[in-house]
UniProtKB/Swiss-Prot annotation:
Cleaved on the N-terminus before locating to the plasma membrane. N-glycosylated. Acts as a zinc-influx transporter which plays a role in zinc homeostasis and in the induction of epithelial-to-mesenchymal transition (EMT). Its main location: membrane. The lineage of its organism: Eukaryota, Metazoa, Chordata, Craniata, Vertebrata. This is Zinc transporter ZIP6. It comes from Danio rerio.
């Protein structure tokens, strides 16, 4: 009734009119004259005013005619059941949701992975630079994570350990305005998808006796719940001050020790674990209802979204105001290889130094392998082994360049996600692209090899047919010139200074009469197979036919010598060069090569253990035949075994220098390692495709005593093995880790 009296003609009555109307109504109900009750007015005025204010406040606040509306719990429960049933029909089976179904649900709402969003910041008055250190660990392991944040404002620089933020909208008591820092910029730290703090339903939802809070809630994280033995743990307590907002602390800190809200991007396994549920068990409708607040908190806090600046991916410039609260900051550790504000990497530097020194030492010891292979250097199996090693080097060099170095130089490297919901397809896309490029190289290698084998097969058939025809003609001829007459003609041609071309061509045609065994024994064009043999072992007739065959294969090269002269010239050339000159050539030529290899290995180990291992395997495989070749050259030059080993080891020291420079550049210089990877990829591709592939294609298999088909299979085995090694390292590089236990 009083609410009705407070309005007149649809408008709100004033205070005086409302009091007068209340008095008149009261006395009329009592049946008393209004004029006789004037004396009661001083006593009734305060009571009626309070009653009127109470009626207006119960109504709807500002409008006295408003009516309070209560929530229909029955409808809310029905709606909840309807939505839950829809979710269970889509992601569950037989009234329950499995772990796989929960993963699909998280994927559907965008909580399956961390998403990066490019944010463009317009002109800002102040710069606030964030640089993140991320390190990924295994699934469901709780570790500490440190975010070094450097704040620059005016001339004041301070470094704090920044916790992972939640969007804040705390009202300002003085001005009535909200802070615009996180609401305007939406800057969120990148969190671990696999390791987070404990997540429970906030107690302000379940406890009615909890004190009222402002619009944003602060959750104090407990340090004691984490293991103190975790590495790289940094705890820092700090207070943010504001001019207008008073400092407050939580009185119920003991409640938060057991009910902390997680602000990180959690996977399905972690959500179940933090709610006290087993991963093997299926979720019922009641169980799933407990997870809904946690999922809503993750969606609301946008903890699975990472914002990157369009111009600088690691530096976010924004104007930032800090709220007043005390935090005990705890973070989760990720093994990404991002750099912090000083340009240093989160990968422990001792791993880079240890891996680099071990790799360079092992590669340098390849010079000693030549000592073991000395007895095999003049045998057929040595050429067989070198052919396989050259093919293996081609596979590892090109595989490392296309599957590892180029993807890393473009920033498409693995971040070490070993959790179930990692974007495995997206992270491996550069690997499959590089594998496609490798398949193109291999297809061209096969085509060229098949063309060579086809041409050799055709020439062989034509040669056999021609030999048969010539033999038939010789047998049918009545007058066949004897071998002595041929020798006379040859001597005449020699005395005429090689002018008798017709006679020489006749002798070359006569050489076709020899069978394959005679040709192999007498008409061999290479002089390396007979190094060290005396002149008495060769007949003049054999020597001369060797000259003619070699002369014909060299297209009448003017510098044609006998086998004896060629060998003596080669030996004399090395002897005139001297040991000092040869040593200088080996140290400078091979040393520069080792320096570039060490530079690549050092930079790769600063990127990670798997990266360093991949590059080390590639360098090892191509250095093995290279070192064996250098060792053989030095021995044939007249050096002793000890001298050859010494000079090879001296050239290997350049690898240590390159490794040291590579680690220093890769670990302390920002964004330089990517350029080193690109340069190394170019060097590896050049060595593989320009130096080693031609050696494989033009290798004379008949010299080593093997068929061309056998060499073809051997070289294919080496190339495919090299490709396979690099592919395995590229695919499983996130699982290659070194844990020394401290």
């Amino acid at each position: 009734m009083m609410t009705f009296l407070c309005t007149r003609s649809g408008r709100r009555a004033s205070g005086v009119e409302c009091r007068i109307a209340a008095e008149r109504a009261y006395f009329r109900v009592r049946g008393l004259p209004v004029a006789n009750m004037i004396g009661w007015w001083p006593r009734l005025c305060p009571v009626m005013s309070l009653a009127l204010l109470w009626a207006c406040s119960v109504g709807a606040g500002s409008d006295c005619k408003s009516v309070a509306i209560e929530t229909d719990s029955r409808i809310a429960e029905q709606t909840q059941q309807r939505h839950l049933q829809a979710l269970f029909d889509k992601y569950g089976q037989n009234g329950s949701i499995s772990l796989e179904g929960l993963f699909n649900l998280l994927k559907g709402v965008g909580l399956d992975r961390i998403r990066k969003v490019m944010v463009h910041h317009p002109g800002n008055a102040h710069n606030h630079t964030h640089t993140h250190d991320h390190t990924h660990t295994h699934v469901d392991k709780l570790t500490a994570h440190t975010h070094p944040v450097t704040t620059k404002k005016g001339d004041m620089d301070h470094s704090v350990e920044k916790s992972d933020p939640v969007p804040k909208a705390q009202p300002d008591p003085a001005s009535g305005k909200k802070s615009q820092s996180d609401a305007h910029h939406n800057l969120y730290m990148k969190m671990n998808q696999e390791s987070t703090t404990a997540l429970t339903t906030p107690s302000y939802v379940t406890r009615s006796r909890r004190t009222n809070r402002s619009a944003d809630y602060d959750f104090t994280q407990d340090h004691a719940s984490f293991s103190p033995s975790q590495p790289n743990v940094t705890h820092s307590n700090h207070t943010h001050h504001d001019e207008d907002t008073p400092t407050h602390q939580h009185d119920d800190h003991d409640e938060h020790e057991h009910a902390r809200a997680s602000l990180g991007c959690q996977n399905a396994s972690t959500i179940l674990q933090t709610h006290g549920m087993r991963k093997e068990a299926s979720l019922s409708v009641k169980d799933f209802s407990f997870l809904c607040p946690a999922l809503l908190m993750q969606i609301d806090s946008k903890s699975c979204i990472v914002h990157e600046d369009e111009d600088e991916h690691s530096d976010h410039s924004h104007h930032h105001k800090h709220h007043h609260h005390h935090h005990d900051h705890q973070h989760l550790q990720h093994p990404h290889n991002h750099t912090n504000g000083r340009g240093q990497r989160n990968t422990p530097v001792y791993i880079a130094w240890l891996g680099g020194f071990l790799s360079i030492t092992l590669i340098s010891l390849l010079a000693l392998v030549g000592v073991v292979l000395i007895p095999l250097m003049n045998r057929v199996c040595f050429n067989f082994l070198l052919s396989f090693l050259v093919a293996l080097a081609v596979g590892t060099l090109s595989g490392d360049a296309l599957l590892h170095l180029i993807p890393h130089s473009q920033g498409h490297h693995h971040h070490g996600h070993s959790e179930e919901h990692a974007e495995e397809e997206d992270s491996l896309r550069p690997v499959w692209t590089g594998l496609t490029a490798l398949s193109g190289v291999y297809i061209m290698f096969l085509i060229e090899h098949f063309l060579t084998l086809g041409k050799m097969y055709k020439d062989k058939n034509q040669k056999v047919q021609k030999r048969v025809d010539l033999t038939t003609e010789v047998l049918e001829s009545e007058k066949l010139p004897s071998l002595e007459e041929n020798d006379v003609k040859i001597e005449a041609a020699e005395t005429n200074g090689g002018r008798a071309l017709a006679e020489e061509e006749e002798v070359m045609l006569g050489a076709e009469l020899y069978n394959d065994i005679d040709c192999e024994n007498k008409c061999h064009s290479h002089f390396h197979d007979t190094v060290g043999q005396s002149d008495e072992q060769h007949h003049h007739h054999h020597d001369y036919h060797h000259i003619l065959h070699h002369h014909h294969s060299q297209n009448h090269h003017p510098h044609t010598h006998t086998h004896r002269h060629t060998h003596s010239y080669s030996q004399q050339h090395f002897e005139q060069a001297g040991v000092a000159t040869l040593a200088w050539m080996v140290i400078m030529g091979d040393g520069l090569h080792n320096f570039s290899d060490g530079l690549a290995i050092g930079a790769a180990f600063t990127e990670g253990l798997s990266s360093g291992l991949s590059t080390s395997v590639a360098v090892f495989c191509h250095e093995l035949p290279h070192e064996l070749g250098d060792f053989a050259v030095l021995l044939k030059a007249g050096m002793s075994v000890r001298q050859a080993m010494l000079y090879n080891l001296l050239s290997a020291l350049m690898g240590y220098l390159g490794m040291i420079i590579g680690i220093l550049i890769g670990h302390y210089a920002e964004n330089v390692a990517t350029w080193i990877f690109a340069l190394t990829a170019g060097l590896f591709m050049y060595v593989a495709l320009v130096d080693m592939v031609p050696e494989m294609l033009h290798n004379d298999a008949s010299e080593a005593g093997f068929s061309h088909y056998g060499f073809f299979l051997l070289q294919n085995a080496g190339i495919l093995l090299g490709f396979g090694i690099m592919l395995i390292i590229a695919v499983f590089e996130d699982r290659i880790q070194l844990d020394l236990g401290y």
